[in-house]
Regions:
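Sec-dependent signal peptide cleavage junction
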Residues: 5-16
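Structured catalytic cores of large enzymes
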Residues: 79-164, 303
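Active-site-proximal C-terminal subdomain of hydrolase catalytic domains
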Residues: 293-423
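A domain-level signal for caspase-like cysteine endopeptidase catalytic cores
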Residues: 31, 37-49, 62-66, 130-254, ...
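Second-shell loop/turn segments in exported
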Residues: 27-28, 46-57, 168-177, 297-304, ...
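Structural recognition of the beta-strand scaffold that forms the well-ordered cores
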Residues: 165-169, 216-220, 292-297, 323-327
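Cysteine protease catalytic core and zymogen-processing segment of caspase-like enzymes
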Residues: 226-322
Length: 424
């Protein structure tokens, strides 16, 4: 039985039972058990039907009441509880020094906020309630259509595999998902283009430590801006981007991940694990991400307007990534997915990541509000989301230089339909 994991952190108690930041060196089984007790109370609240029906103000009141009770029991530090209404998170610190939080906006509501349909002034692109991996479709530009035809007839003697990609899908558990069918479609299409694509729908912290196996890694998950308090004698606050996973915290995992939890490389929101930039910096400190392209769809991956935070990109580049792409601000779902689709399609055609991204922006707009208004949207969100490239804009997949449109002969439309059907 594991009883402790050594790690740098904070530990001490004052006369009132509050824990202050000094030098906790281990996460014990007792610490993990206390966190699980607190997590059980938090998830009982956030997973309840009553919480789902509450207004945001009512959720805040309920969250603060729950944390007050947990502080009374000595499970969380009372002086660490902090409300960030702008980002919709109540943050806190467990008694052992690990960071936690309660989301005031549920994951499915995050989908609604960024879906650009209904109250946002646009209709869904199709009846998503009826959408399945076989009926979801993504639009094809003419050059991608011709590339798919060329590969079908092997007129360019392309290699069987032009690279390996992984979609780290953590938006939801895929059940009745409005998003997942489109990603399943993209996976199948890219496979047909020679990009061997793995779809990971149960993304874990361990998975995010093995991204170096792929040429292209796509982080398809919710993101947030997390603010927390720290310091013993003088309190400070820090805000940083995080990536939310669907991996639930357990006692065993808390012990295994003890180093990262105590070092604040991993935090817990609503009892689920989330990662900070330092998680990637530590996981790939030896530069294992050599030549990998990282494409993040997460909201606020690079912070927000007037507070751009490049820590995620810097950590991945320091870990050896050749190129990192991510968004500033919250991004509309359909715009983000369309940008991903067009960019990867053109990567698979042999373009550099810089050219592929430029094509996507020319097609869908420099930012999501431009796209939104062109679609007839009437009530755009406050700040436009835009995709930024860091690192080498000339990174590319293993596609021959001579893979050009001029070398492709025209193919029958009905044969292309067969390609797309097999991909779907």
């Amino acid at each position: 039985m594991l009883t402790a994991v050594l790690a740098p952190a904070a530990w001490a108690a004052d006369g009132a039972g509050e824990v202050q930041d000094t030098a906790k060196s281990a996460l014990t089984t007792g610490d993990a058990a206390e966190m699980q007790q607190a997590d059980a109370a938090v998830t009982a609240l956030t997973g309840s039907d009553e919480y789902e029906q509450m207004s945001r103000e009512e959720r805040l009141t309920a969250a603060l009441a729950e944390l007050d009770e947990l502080a009374r029991k000595g499970l969380v530090r009372r002086d660490s509880i902090r409300t960030d209404e702008e980002n919709g998170i109540v943050s806190f610190t467990y008694r052992c020094g690990v960071l936690g939080g309660i989301l005031l906006t549920l994951p499915d509501e995050l989908d609604e906020m960024t879906f650009d349909a209904g109250d946002n002034g646009l209709r869904a692109p199709r009846d998503i309630a009826q959408c399945t991996p076989r009926t979801a479709e993504m639009p094809l530009t003419d050059d991608v259509r011709q590339a798919a035809e060329a590969r079908q007839y092997r007129e360019n003697a392309l290699p069987e595999t032009i690279g390996r990609a992984a979609i780290y899908y953590a938006f939801d558990n895929t059940v009745n998902s409005s998003r997942f069918p489109y990603y399943s479609y993209m996976q199948g299409f890219w496979e047909g283009m020679g990009l061997r694509t793995t779809m990971n729908t149960r993304v874990t912290l361990s998975d995010l430590r093995r991204m170096n196996k792929y040429d292209l890694c796509i982080l398809s998950a919710h993101g947030a801006y997390y603010t927390y308090s720290y310091g013993t004698f003088r309190k400070h606050t820090r805000t940083e981007p995080i990536i939310l996973l669907t991996e639930a915290s357990t006692l065993y995992k808390d012990i295994i991940y003890g180093f990262d939890l105590l070092a604040h490389r991993i935090i817990k929101l609503n009892g689920l694990y989330c990662v900070t930039a330092d998680f990637f910096r530590n996981a790939y400190r030896s530069g294992q991400l050599s030549n990998t392209i990282i494409y993040s769809e997460t909201c606020e991956f690079l912070g927000v307007t007037n507070s751009v935070d490049e820590s995620m990109a810097e950590a991945l580049l320091a870990g050896g990534a050749r190129t990192v792409l991510g968004y500033v601000n919250n991004v509309y779902t359909v715009y983000s997915r369309s940008m991903l689709w067009d960019t990867v399609n053109h990567l698979a055609m042999g373009q550099t990541i810089g050219r592929a991204l430029a094509h996507a922006k020319d097609t869908y707009g420099e930012n999501d509000i431009i796209w939104y208004t062109e679609q007839g949207g009437r009530r755009p969100h406050a700040a436009a989301a835009y995709l930024v490239l860091y690192g080498d804009e000339n990174a590319r997949l293993n596609v021959p230089e001579n893979f050009s449109l001029e070398e492709r002969a025209e193919a029958a439309e009905d044969m292309l339909a067969d390609v797309l059907e097999s991909a779907a």
